[in-house]
Amino acid sequence: MNLSALPALRLVAALIAVAASGAAFGQAKCGLNTGKAAAGEPIMIGAVVGKTGPDDFSASAQAAAAYFKCVNANGGINGRPVEYIVADDQWNPETAAQVASKLVKDRKVVVLAGNTSFVECGANAKMYADEGVMVIAGTGVPRECFFAKNYVPINSGPRISATIAAMYAAKTYQSKRMVCIIPNIPSLGNWGCEGAKAWGKANGVEVETIAIDPGSADATSTMLQAAAKKPDTIIMHMPKGLLVPMMAAAEQQGMGKKIHFVSSAPAYNADVPKAIGPYWNKNFAVNLEFNPLSAAGPDNKNWQAVLDQFGAKSDPRDTFSQAGYVAARLVTETLLKMDPKKIDRASVSDALRKVSDFRSDILCKPFYVGSGNRHNANNSGPMAIVDGNGFANVPGGCVTADDPELVDVRADELKLGLK
C-alpha cells in the first residue's frame, strides 16, 4: 500500500466513527440460551478487518466475537460451537486478498460475519462470489461494499446517510439550495454526496458538492467557498478531525445565524457537541445509521450485556460494535434453523439469501439479504440534534432515504414482499 495514502485513510476511518458507552442491562441472551457449553464439531466462521495500520477498524468483529462466545456458552449451533477466525488485512488490498483466501480456501469457512475494512470490498468481492461464500459485514464504507452480490453490509453507508440529512433539511428548514462538503477520497468522494444531489434534482432542491483534500484543506477557505454559493443548508460529510475546525471557522464567520448545518453519521460522536461548542446548541442536526446507542430497546440492551459479559472492557461500545452484534445475531439465527449435520458453505449461503424479515430494534426496519446483485437493506435512520453536551432525538423517528440509486434495491424489496 502507498504510505502516502495513510493520512487520508486515517480520516476515512473516522468518517463513520462514533463514540459512546452503555451500561449492562441484565443477563445476555444468545442462541439457544441453554446455559450449557457447546462441545460438538466446530462451525468455521471468518472475518476480515483492518485492525493494524492507520487505525483500528475491528470493533464490529470484536462485538461479533463476544456474541459467538455467548452462543458457545449457551448450546452453540444446536450443539456445535462456532470457531470464529478474525484476519487482519492491515489496510492493504494485497494482504486483504491473501488473508481472505486463507479463510475461504484453506480454513473452509462457511460464512464471514462482522467484516469491517476499507480495502477488502474491492479486493475480495469477486473471490467471495466465485467461491459461493456470503459475507454479512458489520460496516461498509467505499462504494464497492454496496455493489457486490455476496457482500451484505449491516450499516446504511455514507451516501444514504447524507441523503437523509438533506431530506431532513428540506423538510425542517424548507431549504432549496444546499452544499455538501466531503473529502475527495477514492470510492467515497463525490459518490457520498451524489445521493443528496440526485434526490434534490428530483425534488426542486439544488445540491452542489465541494470535494476537499483531507490532508491540506483550509477550514476558513472551505467555509467561505461554501458560503459564496449562498446555500440555505450546508451538509457536513466528514470525520470529526475535519468537522471540528470547519465548524469553528463557520462560527467565526457567523454562518450559523443564516445557514442551517446538518451532517451525515460521522458527527454522531459523543465528543462532538462539546468540541464544537455552545454556538451550535440546537443548531446542528446529524443522521444516525442505527437507532441511538442509548436506546432502551431489548436488543440494544442485549448488545450491551453481551459486550459486558463476553467481551473485553476495552471493546468499543459504538455503532461499529452495534453492527457487528447484529451481523453475528443474524448469522446465528439463520444457522439455528438448519440441520446442524448438514451445515456447509452452499447450504449456509442459500439459507442467508432467504433471510427476508430479520428484526432488531437497533435497526429502523426489518433486514433482509435476498438474491440481488448488491445489498443496501439498511437505508433508513433517525436524526438527532446537538443538545448541550449531547444529542437529542428529533421528532419523526427513522427516515428512509429517497435515493434514486436505490431503484434496484427497491425492486428486490418488492420481490421479497417488503415495503
Where in this protein do the model-derived segments appear?
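Beta-alpha junction/loop-to-helix N-cap segments that form part of ligand/metal-binding clefts
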Residues: 28-34, 56-62, 74-145, 154, ...
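An alpha-beta-alpha
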Residues: 151-214, 233, 311, 322
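Segments of small-molecule ligand-sensing domains
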Residues: 309-321, 332-395
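Hydrophobic alpha-helical segments within soluble ligand-binding/sensing domains
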Residues: 31, 96, 154-178, 190, ...
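Periplasmic-binding protein-like
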Residues: 103-116, 136-138, 178-182, 230-240, ...
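Extracytoplasmic "Venus flytrap"
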Residues: 31-65, 87-94, 116-117, 181-191, ...
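Extracellular/periplasmic periplasmic-binding protein-like sensory domains
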Residues: 250-325, 397-399, 412-418
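Extracellular/periplasmic bilobed ligand-binding domains
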Residues: 128-131, 192-291
